[in-house]
Amino acid sequence: MTSLRALQLSCVLIICGVTMAASASETATGPEQGVWQKHEYSFQFLGFTTTYSCDGLASKLKVLLIAAGARADAKSTSGACSRGYGTPDKFARAYLKFYTLSAVGTADNASPPISGTWRSVALADRSPRELRLGDCELVEQFRDKVLPMFTTRNIDNRMTCVPNQLSGSVINLKFEVFAKFM
């Protein structure tokens, strides 16, 4: 009876060891080759809770682009707004021009390959520090419209945005992005 239990325990430990080694190899990958892909997008924000000026929207979007793994030279400029510079506008718009890293086999770009790696990203209230709970709907729209332009995996979306109120809203978006190896 004791030898049967010892055999069962040995089998369980071997299976656990193989499983742990397999999962560790999936998450701990070394540098891979990637190329920069250019993206240009006209982003129009439509939300209920927060109203941005066009320059304020452009500023928040640049923070989100860099946090999500865009190249450091990402540009976010204010679009044509009916109310002018610094004034909240219900239809704020920004123009985005940025580069994301794509795996060599998936990109149709002639730029020289560079080393990339998978990096964990977590967007939450005050992470990055410029992000506030009132930005919940903006993060939702960024997730839906801009994040698909990035090479991502393991997206964990636990966003809850309650229109017209901060109470009950939660910014919680986690994912892995293919970004420049540092």
Go through each PLM region and give its residues.
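Glycine-rich, aromatic-bearing surface loops/beta-hairpins
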Residues: 141-182
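Short, intrinsically disordered low-complexity segments
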Residues: 73-105, 176
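Extracytoplasmic/secreted envelope proteins and their assembly/folding machinery
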Residues: 54-58, 62-65, 139-143
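Sec-exported extracytoplasmic/periplasmic mature domains
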Residues: 62-70, 147, 151
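Boundary at the C-terminal end of the N-terminal hydrophobic targeting segment
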Residues: 21-28
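Bacterial N-terminal signal peptides
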Residues: 10-19
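Acidic/histidine-rich, surface-exposed loop or edge segments in extracytoplasmic proteins
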Residues: 33-49, 116-130
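Bacterial N-terminal signal peptides that target proteins for export
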Residues: 1-11
